[in-house]
């Protein structure tokens, strides 16, 4: 397992092993959490790993987007770890996507995704972006190549 700084190597190894074409057109997102939910959780210690289980890797392409499940776990000794990419893989044609927008917030980026009547929000937190050049480069690549709508 590697740290967030090296997640791109793990993701790209998975893509190469499975003959999936990619460039810098992918990002990893955490599920959207509500701070109030975390703060007022009934348990004495909030289980962040429970919420991180719904993390995804999104591969943005001109004709479709591919969504890959992944396991993200928080370990005190080694930080946030990424593993088991692609247990679930879904390919969604672009014409079925109603909204696909990346919005820059104060402390994070949020991805808004709507497919017909189903909508989801995911996030890339500020701590996830700092010193993770691959994340910033990939966001810039997606914007420059118009693979995602971007709003500041």
Task: Please identify what each model-predicted range represents.
Residues 35-38, 64-68, 74-76, 118-124:
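Short, surface-exposed beta-strand/loop "edge" segments at domain boundaries and coil↔beta transitions
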Residues 82-152:
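Acidic, Ser/Thr- and proline-rich intrinsically disordered linker/docking segments
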């Amino acid at each position: 397992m590697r740290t967030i700084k090296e997640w791109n190597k793990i993701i790209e190894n998975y893509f190469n092993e499975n003959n999936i074409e990619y460039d810098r057109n992918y990002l990893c997102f955490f599920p959207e959490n509500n701070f109030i939910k975390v703060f007022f959780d009934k348990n004495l210690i909030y289980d962040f790993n429970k919420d991180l289980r719904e993390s995804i890797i999104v591969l943005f392409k001109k004709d479709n987007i591919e969504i890959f499940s992944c396991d993200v776990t928080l370990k005190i000794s080694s930080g946030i770890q990424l593993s088991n990419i692609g247990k679930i893989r879904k390919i969604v044609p672009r014409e079925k996507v109603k909204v696909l927008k990346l919005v820059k917030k104060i402390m994070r980026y949020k991805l808004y995704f709507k497919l017909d009547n189903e909508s989801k929000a995911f996030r890339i937190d500020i701590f996830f972006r700092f010193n993770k050049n691959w994340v910033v480069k990939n966001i810039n690549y997606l914007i420059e190549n118009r693979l995602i709508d971007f709003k500041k």
